[in-house]
Amino acid sequence: TSGTTILPSLEFVTESAYYDETTKLGGEGAPKVEYVVPEDFPAHTVKAMTDGAERVYEFLSCRGAIRVDFVVDETGTAFALEVNTTPGLQEHSNLPVSCAHAGISYAELLTGLLAQALAEARPAPWVTS
């Protein structure tokens, strides 16, 4: 596709039984969570997630950054769970962490998203000249 960047997958490793809001947002008393790029996924699993995320992006005519969440079973089959069209942009959020693993700095992520938004901006339909 033109200009689409597929970022590395992240696996959430936590001592909690669930990856819930408390775990995700951290803070005092929250279970520790670590985001790692899984090294042990079979190639077909990585390809299925990459291709699936790209197809979703195109099908929904997305712009900017999205996050597609998958769960992978013990056979390596990936199942799409949801599409997040407004992923978090705090430095410790999933999108900036995945960008960091891809060599994209936090500043590059933010300026890239802003530049794309400005380039694609159109006047609102209710604005008259």
Which residue ranges define each predicted feature?
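Beta-strand scaffold of nucleotide-dependent catalytic cores
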Residues: 1-23, 68, 79-84, 93
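Conserved active-site and cofactor/substrate-binding residues in soluble primary-metabolism enzymes
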Residues: 4, 44, 48, 90, ...
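Short, low-complexity, polar/charged sequence segments that are solvent-exposed and flexible
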Residues: 4, 16-17, 25-30, 40-42, ...
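Proline-rich low-complexity regions
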Residues: 8, 35-38, 87, 96
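Generic hydrophobic alpha-helical scaffold/packing signal
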Residues: 10, 53-57, 110, 114
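Active-site/binding-pocket entry motifs
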Residues: 12-15, 27, 89, 119
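A long amphipathic alpha-helix within ATP-dependent nucleotide-binding catalytic cores
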Residues: 28-73, 121, 125-128
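C-terminal active-site "lid" helix and adjoining low-complexity regulatory extension at the edge
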Residues: 72, 77-129
